[in-house]
Amino acid sequence: MRATPQLSVVVPVHNEEDNVAPLVGEIVAALRGLVDFEIVYVDDTSRDSTLERLRDLQATTPELRVIRHLSNAGQSTAVRNGVKAARAPWIATLDGDGQNDPADIPKLIAERAKAAPEVKLFAGWRVNRQDSGSKRWASTWRIKRAAVLSQQ
């Protein structure tokens, strides 16, 4: 790993003890040998063993960095703090619950390589999501609320 990675993968987590090891493994499998990268996990004061499992993973995953909030601040703040801590010029974000496939990151990297220099953002669109009904309802509500507030 270079002193300054080319890509930072930011992953906010809260109570994801069963998901951190598989997701770290998937990120490493997708990126190691392709690009110099770091993985920045931001633990938003998990009450389970998420932090301990991340610390254990650091022993075998040199790309892994772990940041912990002192108090619960929410997913958006965790992403923001992860981005601020990132050392690479390019940043990918993944949800800590495994809903995003790290294998898609190389596809975005390939598109970036073909793009004009003025292009600064690459994004994917998830299909066949596995979200619960309550999560879909909450997402829809937040989007509609933001739309109403932006018109005021």
List where the protein language model places each region:
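Acidic helix N-cap motif at the loop->helix transition within catalytic regions
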Residues: 18-22, 48-57
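Conserved donor nucleotide-binding strand/loop of the catalytic core
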Residues: 36-41, 51-85
